[in-house]
Each structure stands twice: as C-alpha cells, then as structure tokens.
Curated annotation (Swiss-Prot):
Enzyme type, top EC level: lyase
Reactions accelerated catalytically: (2R,3S)-3-isopropylmalate = (2S)-2-isopropylmalate
Record's protein name: 3-isopropylmalate dehydratase small subunit
InterPro entries: 3-IsopropMal_deHydase_ssu, Aconitase/3IPM_dehydase_swvl, AconitaseA/IPMdHydase_ssu_swvl, IPMI_Swivel, LeuD
EC number: 4.2.1.33
UniProt superkingdom: Bacteria
Biological processes annotated in GO: L-leucine biosynthetic process
Organism from which the protein derives: Pseudomonas fluorescens (strain ATCC BAA-477 / NRRL B-23932 / Pf-5)
Gene: leuD
Pathway(s) per entry: Amino-acid biosynthesis; L-leucine biosynthesis; L-leucine from 3-methyl-2-oxobutanoate: step 2/4
Amino acid sequence: MKAFTQHNGLVAPLDRANVDTDQIIPKQFLKSIKRTGFGPNLFDEWRYLDVGQPYQDNSKRPLNKDFVLNAERYQGASVLLARENFGCGSSREHAPWALEEYGFRSIIAPSYADIFFNNSFKNGLLPIILSDAEVDELFQQVEATPGYQLRIDLQAQTVTRPDGKVLKFEIDAFRKHCLLNGLDDIGLTLQDGDAIAAFEAKHRASQPWLFRDA
C-alpha cells in the first residue's frame, strides 16, 4: 500500500450528500476480483450519458459535460470534497479501489458511512472529517477559485488552505501509523514474519506427525 505523509492536491467539489457505493462504482463492474481496473468507471452513471459495461472502451462513450470530474478545471484532481454520509450503501471495497485508482489520495467530508470509512484507510485513501461549516467554506472557495489546492499533512493532522488558514482533523493513532508507513492488513502481518516462522518451526518440531506428508 502506498504511504501517505503529505500531499498537495487539486480539489474537486462533489456537492452531493449521501453518495452511496453503487454511485461510486456501479454493480456491473464488480465481477472482477482484482483490485485494479475500476478507476475508469468511477462515478460511471454520472460521468457518462450511456449505461457502462465491463471492459468497454470508455473513450468512445458520450460524456456528461455537466459532471464535475469532466470539467477541464478539475482534471488531475487528487482531493475530493464531498458532503455528509459519503460512501453509504453496500459494503463493497471496490469503492475506495476506484477512487484511489482514479487518482484521489484523500476525501474531505463532514461524515462517512462506517464501512467505507474503514475500507479507505486499508487502501491508502485518507478520509478526513471536518465540520459542516469548514466544508461549506471550502466548497465556496473551490468553486470561486480555479486551480484551488489544499496541503494535507497527516503527521500534523492539518489541512492548509491557499489563504494560509489551517484546519485540524482527528484520526485514530493506529490508522495514522498504518497510513504513514504504507501498511495494509498484509503488510502488518508481514511485520511479524520472523515470529510466525519461528512459531511454525517450533510447531513442526513438537508435532512432527502432523507434517509427514507436507
């Protein structure tokens, strides 16, 4: 998993509340068990005017020019600004996969659905919670300022606006440690690789009859 320490990124404003996981990545794209290939279909039903299908050539599909991610000024955005209860709906982990593969490193919103919130941390995506008032002000500034960027510092737990104002956010210490060091569940397990190998060797030596055919 890619570590997250500091990030300067262009902000895209998704001014909708209760964005669910089926809107983030529609159900027809969930057939793959790989963690890649979902970025091109992020917000598929909003980005395109037709109904998307797996393995389709998106370059030939009609774009919804009114959708924020299709606007020229938000191309290359890596910070998504959203409203309350982002990521609600079914518990598909494909949602943070799609957001991360598209290029987003962080989401800023007043609240998230619990399962999406947890899955984001496990996939290198930083979901930041700010107050409604702080989010409202960010929406106003982003929409009024082309090229609006934020500086996110995970170690300091701060979001710095272009005008210099610093917004503080809270994060669980364990999740912060994992993101700073790029540790997902597999990475955490591998940290104990020597201890696991020692246990297996001891177990094999003490009960060799269990491993005669191994």
